[in-house]
Amino acid sequence: MSRVCQVTGKRPVTGNNRSHALNATKRRFLPNLHSHRFWVESEKRFVTLRVSAKGMRIIDKKGIETVLSELRARGEKY
């Protein structure tokens, strides 16, 4: 399963670890992803989404119905 937020599209980015001596070693910054079940009242069922913390805040703000309609418009499976 890829580490991509289904709502925001956040994905891992690359950067460097920096030691005290400023040696650079490659690393990945991973998004804060969680599998979360959301109740969809219109469908009378739970929908499981893999979302970041920011994605959960967007769902709280817009509502799950609106977010799911945006996912459908993008052709995203959920």
Swiss-Prot record:
One cellular component term from this protein's GO annotations in UniProt: cytosolic large ribosomal subunit
InterPro entries documented for this protein: Ribosomal_bL28 (IPR026569), Ribosomal_bL28/bL31-like_sf (IPR034704), Ribosomal_bL28_bact-type (IPR001383), Ribosomal_bL28_sf (IPR037147)
Pfam families named in the record: Ribosomal_L28 (PF00830)
Gene Ontology MF annotations: structural constituent of ribosome
Keywords for the protein's UniProt record, in alphabetical order: Ribonucleoprotein, Ribosomal protein
Keyword Magnesium: no
Keyword Glycosyltransferase listed: no
One BP term from GO: translation
Family: Belongs to the bacterial ribosomal protein bL28 family.
HAMAP family in UniProt: Ribosomal_bL28
PANTHER family: 39S RIBOSOMAL PROTEIN L28, MITOCHONDRIAL, LARGE RIBOSOMAL SUBUNIT PROTEIN BL28M
Full protein name: Large ribosomal subunit protein bL28
Source organism: Salmonella typhimurium (strain LT2 / SGSC1412 / ATCC 700720)
